[in-house]
Design a protein with these regions (language model features):
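Conserved catalytic or regulatory cores that recognize and/or transform ribose-phosphate-containing ligands
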Residues: 144, 150, 162
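Nucleotide-sugar donor-binding catalytic core of glycosyltransferases
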Residues: 1-125, 132-146, 196
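C-terminal "capping" alpha-helix adjacent to the active site of nucleotide-linked donor transferases
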Residues: 158-177
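Non-transmembrane alpha-helical segments in soluble domains
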Residues: 76-77, 81, 102, 167-170, ...
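C-terminal helix of von Willebrand factor
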Residues: 11, 164-168, 201
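A charged, aromatic-enriched C-terminal amphipathic alpha-helix characteristic of glycosyltransferases
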Residues: 176-207
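Active-site/pore-lining binding-face segments in mid-to-C-terminal subdomains
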Residues: 123, 131, 178, 182
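A short acidic/histidine/glycine-rich donor-binding loop in glycosyltransferase catalytic cores
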Residues: 150-157
Length: 210
């Protein structure tokens, strides 16, 4: 499981043993993508499901599922989708689902990975595709446990600073530091989150249990 241990035990019984295993990057899908400098740089990509922030919808969803509804789980991602310099794709009912997701990512220099409660697979798919990743990393979602480093392998954002961080990039998009951070994030993601490494870790776990 690639969730933080504290989150894992919020979902599963306390007596379940926990072992962190990262996976999700199928290396062959992230080869030969468009070079960073040839990508869209005046827009930031935001993708995945978001919540409906209309007042009545939030009330209904909070009654049905007060913690795990799509808005509560994706608060920052939902807010980002409203910005005029952000291109939003639902990745549902289009050409960029599942194995084709890297083909969407390669169009943009930058993309957003945001989740309220825990980092998800998007956090390493985005840098694996060579994008500069704007990652929601907070005390609540324990994003530090992924190993990414702010301003070295990604750019950390939260609900207070996300607009400022986006503008810092957009106002200086030609600065070579963005490409350097994207490349460092790419190297880190491909090395630590590829499926071969995940299978190896799972095999080690199985050996421990036998």
């Amino acid at each position: 499981n690639f969730f933080p241990e504290s989150f894992f035990h919020k979902v599963y019984p306390k007596e379940f043993n926990y072992k962190k295993i990262f996976y999700g990057v199928e290396s062959s899908l992230f080869k030969d993508l468009k070079p960073f400098n040839d990508r869209i740089k005046n827009k930031i990509l935001n993708s995945g499901n978001i919540g409906n922030d209309k007042f009545l919808n939030k009330i209904i969803n909070d009654i049905r599922n007060p913690k795990w509804n799509s808005y509560r789980c994706k608060i920052l991602r939902s807010k980002c989708s409203k910005l005029n310099f952000v291109d939003y794709f639902s990745t549902i009912n289009n050409d960029y689902v599942n194995d084709h997701y890297p083909l969407l990512l390669q169009k943009y220099q930058t993309a957003i990975a945001a989740d309220t409660y825990t980092p998800v697979q998007k956090y390493w798919e985005i840098p694996a595709a060579g994008c500069l990743a704007f990652m929601e990393v907070t005390e609540k979602n324990e994003g530090l446990h992924t190993g990414f480093i702010d301003n070295e392998t990604s750019i950390f954002i939260n609900e207070k600073n996300y607009v400022q961080k986006f503008q810092e990039y957009l106002e200086d998009a030609n600065n070579p530091k963005w490409k350097e951070i994207a490349q460092a994030g790419n190297d880190f993601a491909l090395k630590n989150f590829n499926n071969d490494a995940g299978v190896s870790s799972l095999a080690d776990l199985m050996a421990e249990l036998i």
